[in-house]
């Protein structure tokens, strides 16, 4: 079929398999060009490995460190009627390219929150790898099915205490609007912590530990975002922030647990990037368009792959083998360049000046749109989007259920 982009709200409902593979190839090429990561882990499990930072983590481990990787994700394959999810095509492309490079790669598709996912992963590790040296936790899901009761819990992208009103961009109409978001209820806050906090990360590590598949010196890392006062009301000071604080709590508990085997647990605070997750957060697209422009001008802009390569090579697995620098909460900070005073001051000054008329001139809004559509495999140079493509790609993926 011939596949064109169809945007609805903040998601693109179609995906292009050839474009998704091109994205994965681009990240692999970047990683290889940087050179091998010294002291890299050799057996890596990535929970949430099909897009964004999770996918980049799998690429860094495999193509930067030569690691055997197992990826866990929840994605839909294509059928003869419609394309699959971008994550499915990303994961399929990764597997194919890893195998071509002579690397071990196996993937589990299903609900990563489930007990079954953990058991399947453990069986696979025992069967093929013995143990794991690094566990990356990179799940971004709006819903969690509780593993023991089957109850569905939903997260809320809402402020706490009062209605939040701010300038934002309507990405469908490309106009500046005033966006208002009602505050979260106590129940919504608790639910957001349940879905996006650290509990499932702890359950993964506990299951792996009890099964004896965590190697001596095993590290684990989970990803977070803190941002700045421009986004704090909706993010760090909102329901989502409570969940991210719970991730910090989990990291502290896991760090104590893993210390016995010479291991560590850290939250890595990453920069804002264009992902399906961030596009759903009011205010984020406009903030990203602003901060990207300034960071590009300063030569410090990074996408997912650049961030994760830097995290592996300059934080978790430093060349001299020394412990990584951390902040007061034992977090690895990779948002250091984004949070530079000159960059943030620029955004603060610019924010009130943005109008529909000057949006494209004062920010990297067009670049934001390009990166967004690229997530789904569109707008990539060298791909013929009028050509017939097969939405059903070959992928020897293991179904969890």
UniProtKB/Swiss-Prot annotation:
Site: Plays an important role in discriminating NADH against NADPH. Where?
A: 75
UniProt keywords (A-Z) are: Fatty acid biosynthesis, Fatty acid metabolism, Lipid biosynthesis, Lipid metabolism, NAD, Oxidoreductase
**Reactions this protein catalyses:** a 2,3-saturated acyl-[ACP] + NAD(+) = a (2E)-enoyl-[ACP] + NADH + H(+); a 2,3-saturated acyl-CoA + NAD(+) = a (2E)-enoyl-CoA + NADH + H(+); (2E)-butenoyl-[ACP] + NADH + H(+) = butanoyl-[ACP] + NAD(+); butanoyl-CoA + NAD(+) = (2E)-butenoyl-CoA + NADH + H(+)
Family annotation (Pfam families): Eno-Rase_FAD_bd, Eno-Rase_NADH_b, Enoyl_reductase
- E.C. no: 1.3.1.9, 1.3.1.44
The record's InterPro entries line, in alphabetical order, gives:
Eno_Rdtase_FAD-bd_dom (IPR024906), Enoyl-CoA_Rdtase_cat_dom (IPR024910), FabV-like_NADH_b (IPR050048), Trans-2-enoyl-CoA_reductase (IPR010758)
* Positions bound to NAD(+): 48-53, 74-75, 111-112, 139-140, 244, 273-275
List of residues binding substrate: 225
Biological or metabolic pathway of the protein: Lipid metabolism; fatty acid biosynthesis
Task: List, in alphabetical order, the Gene Ontology terms for molecular function in this entry.
Answer: enoyl-[acyl-carrier-protein] reductase (NADH) activity; NAD binding; trans-2-enoyl-CoA reductase (NADH) activity
How activity is regulated?
Weakly inhibited by triclosan.
Q: How does it assemble?
A: Monomer.
The role this protein plays is:
Involved in the final reduction of the elongation cycle of fatty acid synthesis (FAS II). Catalyzes the NADH-dependent reduction of a carbon-carbon double bond in an enoyl moiety that is covalently linked to an acyl carrier protein (ACP). It can use both crotonyl-CoA and crotonyl-ACP.
UniProt lists the family membership as follows: Belongs to the TER reductase family.
Q: Kindly provide the name given to this protein in its UniProt entry.
A: Enoyl-[acyl-carrier-protein] reductase [NADH] 1
Lineage of source species = Bacteria, Pseudomonadati, Pseudomonadota, Gammaproteobacteria, Vibrionales
């Amino acid at each position: 079929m011939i596949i064109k982009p169809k945007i609805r709200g903040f998601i693109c409902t179609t995906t292009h398999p050839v474009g998704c593979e091109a994205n994965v190839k681009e990240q692999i090429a970047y990683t290889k060009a940087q050179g091998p990561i010294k002291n890299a882990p050799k057996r890596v499990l990535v929970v949430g490995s099909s897009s964004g930072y999770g996918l980049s983590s799998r690429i860094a481990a495999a193509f930067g460190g030569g690691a055997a990787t197992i990826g866990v994700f929840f994605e839909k394959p294509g059928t003869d009627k419609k394309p699959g999810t971008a994550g499915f095509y990303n994961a399929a492309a990764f597997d194919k390219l890893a195998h071509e490079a002579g690397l071990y790669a196996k993937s589990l598709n299903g609900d990563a929150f489930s007990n079954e996912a953990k058991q399947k992963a453990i069986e696979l590790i025992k069967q093929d790898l013995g143990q794991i040296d690094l566990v990356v936790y990179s799940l971004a899901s709006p819903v969690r099915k509780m593993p023991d009761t089957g109850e569905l819990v939903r997260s809320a992208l809402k402020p706490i205490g009062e209605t939040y009103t701010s300038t934002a961009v309507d990405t469908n109409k490309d106009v500046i609007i005033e966006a208002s978001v009602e505050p979260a209820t106590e129940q919504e806050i608790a639910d957001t912590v349940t879905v996006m906090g650290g509990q499932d990360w702890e359950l993964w590590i506990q299951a792996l530990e009890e099964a004896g598949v965590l190697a001596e010196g095993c590290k684990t890392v989970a990803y977070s975002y803190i941002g700045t006062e421009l986004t704090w009301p909706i993010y760090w000071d909102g329901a989502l922030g409570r969940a991210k604080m719970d991730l910090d709590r989990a990291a502290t508990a896991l760090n104590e647990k893993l210390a016995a085997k010479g291991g560590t647990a850290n939250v890595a605070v990453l920069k804002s990037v264009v992902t399906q997750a961030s596009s759903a957060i009011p205010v984020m697209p406009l903030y990203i368009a602003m901060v990207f422009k300034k960071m590009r001008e300063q030569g410090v802009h990074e996408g997912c792959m650049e961030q994760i390569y830097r995290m592996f090579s300059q934080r978790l697995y430093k060349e001299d083998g020394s412990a990584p620098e951390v902040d007061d909460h034992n977090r690895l900070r990779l948002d250091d360049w984004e949070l530079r005073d000159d960059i943030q001051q620029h955004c603060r000054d610019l924010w009130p000046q943005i109008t529909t008329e000057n949006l494209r001139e004062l920010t990297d809004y067009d670049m934001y749109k390009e990166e967004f559509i690229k997530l789904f495999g569109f707008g990539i140079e060298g791909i013929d989007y009028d050509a017939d493509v097969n939405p059903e790609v070959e992928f020897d993926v293991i179904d969890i259920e």
